[in-house]
From Swiss-Prot:
Entry note: cofactor: Binds 1 prenylated FMN per subunit.
Name of this chain's protein: Ferulic acid decarboxylase 1
InterPro entries: FDC-like (IPR032903), UbiD (IPR002830), UbiD-like_C (IPR049381), UbiD-like_N (IPR049383), UbiD_Rift_dom (IPR048304)
Keyword Oxidoreductase: no
HAMAP family per UniProt: UbiD_FDC (MF_01983)
A Pfam short name: UbiD_N
Family: Belongs to the UbiD family. UbiD-like/FDC subfamily.
Enzyme Commission number(s) of this protein: 4.1.1.102
Lineage: Eukaryota, Fungi, Dikarya, Ascomycota, Saccharomycotina
Keywords of this entry: Cytoplasm, Decarboxylase, Flavoprotein, FMN, Lyase, Manganese, Metal-binding
Active site: 285
pH dependence: Optimum pH is 7-8.
Biological processes per GO annotation: cinnamic acid catabolic process; ferulate catabolic process; ferulate metabolic process
């Protein structure tokens, strides 16, 4: 029997989830109009198995089933970050800290560019539709939230764009809404790389004929990396190869020269226009809101060809209150880049994380106190240095508050983070504002305020390290069970717990 490779093969990923009892195959007819979304939200919020909708109302034989919650959390007994771990081919019990550190280790590996395979070895080419045969509105595309502006086909697929000189190929995730039978509209915003590449076409007079591909069911490692804010000019495909330890098989598109993962479930291709726009949104996003009737003109994608596998499967993310892919992937992957940036910048940072409970708006940095004291700096100087490093780079684009904590805090435990936050900083006095940096337009307090016109500021660094800790060790007792009593006594209590009468 062939060994499953869930990081490279999307269908192997699904099989692994099934083998681990982390998949519910729903054969009852389900309506893609809100019912799919409702089931997904309940599964996310209860850390339940991923739903595979095999009988969607309005679906044809091969187009399509839906896999929901592909990177949602699951029960701790199964490894709560198991689905994310499987995206990388790691043990399902791998912790999020270990996942972040593994991604950093992979950056030291030799990049492996994709390998071109013949059409006969590309399952995504099983069925091919030309432009006149494409009817996007006939697909069972989910309408995910009440008051969304439309049906969102693209929530967990991968856009592929390439600069005109072909030196930089970008794989990325950005939402996409069906407009009509031939068109999709979606976010193409600065400073995201998809916009930078689109602008490079505009610079040569081709703003309305930018080649694109939109791929679904790509290698899970690829969809994970496409969420990362990696440096400008770096092609994600080579880094994916380093993670996998092998090159991603790719095949040429039907209507342009872009190369797409050969095992993709579905591939839509055509041209993007920055000059032709359509109202996009609103959409229930990563911060947990749909703001009714608040759409915006966005660039238009014209679909000119479509290819797909037998019994194609569409992976779907349904953003909202934590925890879903916009937190588990985007948040943790930004944290990975944040930790690397700290290392490159010489900051005494031990770990970085974006706690899910903060809806991907907070970045927590765990500071090595001995390293901090060696800098002979002040809280004010250090906060400014940290803010200048992060808020002026793409890594800090979605972040609105950076929180500095001491090295006694487990930043992957939100209970400890919020304890440090509320007890170790004085509001305003220990917060340094950065009013000249770019705001994140999707943050609700930006989009629903006058700041939406300037797109500046609303960001700060919060110092949750006691001032004296910048100069010397500062002893205090944490008043909890694990840290507040001698280890021998803690062990004794744990050993005798059932004898005391507890279960």
């Amino acid at each position: 029997m062939r060994k499953l490779n869930p990081a490279l093969e999307f269908r192997d990923f699904i099989q692994v989830l099934k083998d681990e009892d982390d998949l519910i195959e729903i054969t009852e007819e389900i309506d893609p109009n809100l019912e799919v979304g409702a089931i997904m939200r309940k599964a996310y919020e209860s850390h339940l198995p991923a739903p595979l909708f095999k009988n969607l109302k309005g679906a044809s034989k091969d187009l399509f089933s839906i896999l929901g919650c592909p990177a949602g959390l699951r029960s701790k007994e199964k490894g709560d970050h198991g689905r994310i771990a499987h995206h990388l081919g790691l043990d399902p019990k791998t912790t999020i800290k270990e996942i972040i550190d593994y991604l950093l280790e992979c950056k030291e590996k030799e990049p492996l560019p994709p390998i071109t395979v013949p059409v006969s070895s590309a399952p995504c080419k099983t069925h091919i539709l030309s432009e006149e045969k494409i009817h996007l509105q006939s697909l069972p595309t989910p309408y995910l939230h009440v008051s969304d502006g439309g049906k969102y086909l693209q929530t967990y697929g991968m856009w592929i764009l390439q600069t005109p000189d072909k030196k930089w190929t970008n794989w990325s995730i950005a939402r996409g809404m069906v407009v009509d039978d031939k068109h999709i509209t979606g976010l193409v915003i600065k400073p995201q790389h998809i916009r930078q590449i689109a602008d490079s076409w505009a610079a040569i007079g081709k703003a309305n004929e930018i080649p694109f591909a939109l791929c679904f069911g790509v290698p899970p490692a690829a969809i994970l990396v496409s969420s990362m804010p990696i440096p400008e000019g770096v092609s994600e495909s080579d880094y994916v190869g380093a993670i996998l330890g092998e090159s991603v098989p790719v095949v040429k598109c039907e209507t342009n020269d872009l190369m797409v993962p050969a095992t993709s479930e579905m591939v839509f291709e055509g041209t993007l226009s920055l000059t032709d726009t359509h109202l996009e949104g609103p959409f229930g996003e990563m911060h947990g809101y749909v703001f009714k009737s608040q759409g915006h003109p966005c660039p238009l994608y014209t679909v000119k060809a479509m290819s797909y596998r037998d019994n194609a499967i569409l992976p779907v993310s349904n953003p909202g209150l934590c925890t879903d892919e916009t937190h588990t992937l985007i948040g943790s992957l930004v944290a990975t880049e944040a930790k690397e940036l700290a290392i490159e910048s010489g900051l005494p940072i031990l770990d970085a994380f974006m706690p899910y409970e903060a809806q991907a708006l907070w970045l927590i940095l765990k500071v090595d106190l001995k390293g901090l004291q060696a800098l002979k700096t002040t809280p004010e100087e250090f906060c400014k240095k940290v803010g200048d490093i992060y808020f002026r780079t793409k890594v800090g684009f979605i972040v609105h508050e950076i929180i500095l904590v001491a090295d006694d805090i487990d930043i992957f435990n939100f209970k400890e983070v919020i304890w440090a936050y509320v007890t170790r900083h004085t509001p305003v006095a220990d917060q340094m504002a950065f009013d000249d940096v770019t705001s994140f337009p999707l943050a609700p307090f930006v989009s629903q305020s006058s700041r939406s016109k300037t797109m500046k500021g609303g960001k700060c660094v919060t110092n949750c390290i006691f001032r004296q800790q910048y100069e010397r060790s500062f002893d205090y007792i944490t008043c909890n069970f694990e840290k507040g009593y001698p280890k021998g006594l803690v062990d004794k209590v744990n050993e005798n717990w059932k004898r005391y009468g507890y279960k």
